[in-house]
Amino acid sequence: MAKKVVAIIKLALEAGKATPAPPVGPALGQRGVNIVMFCKDYNARTADKAGLIIPVEITVYEDKSYTFVLKTPPASVLLAKAAGVQKGSGNPKKTQVGSVTKKQVEEIAQTKLPDLNTRRLESAIRIIEGTAKNMGIGVTD
């Protein structure tokens, strides 16, 4: 018989740098999960993606065991990295903070495709372009 799921916890943590401090500790501690063990597992699986924010979906079972699935980094983080900026524009309609090429947008869309609500690359590219526009990052040819 399958284990009974008690909770599904979603967190966005920096790759390779999960610690028992908030937000990890309180989120997992109240469910009785071994926090240190989760941090070690997460850090081991994300060590190669250092510097990126990696969302994780943790499924906690009745016997206090857990499994977790790593998601792709947020599009805004990937766009900011590609454009070489720290954060998006405070006023994206008037101020552009950087730009990315169509090829970079396509690569980001390819990376994000498993987590987006589309199966087509063309639709994923349009989603990423919309995110770039809302961040004040221009898309050039």
Curated annotation (Swiss-Prot):
CDD domains: Ribosomal_L11. Its main location: plastid. GO terms for molecular function: large ribosomal subunit rRNA binding; structural constituent of ribosome. One of its GO terms (biological process) is translation. GO terms for cellular component: chloroplast; cytosolic large ribosomal subunit. InterPro entries: Ribosomal_uL11, Ribosomal_uL11_bac-typ, Ribosomal_uL11_C, Ribosomal_uL11_C_sf, Ribosomal_uL11_CS, Ribosomal_uL11_N, Ribosomal_uL11_N_sf. Keywords: Chloroplast, Plastid, Ribonucleoprotein, Ribosomal protein, RNA-binding, rRNA-binding. The keyword Transmembrane does not apply. It is found in: Plastid, Chloroplast. Part of the ribosomal stalk of the 50S ribosomal subunit. Interacts with L10 and the large rRNA to form the base of the stalk. L10 forms an elongated spine to which L12 dimers bind in a sequential fashion forming a multimeric L10(L12)X complex. NCBIfam families: L11_bact. Forms part of the ribosomal stalk which helps the ribosome interact with GTP-bound translation factors. Belongs to the universal ribosomal protein uL11 family. This is Large ribosomal subunit protein uL11c. The gene is rpl11.
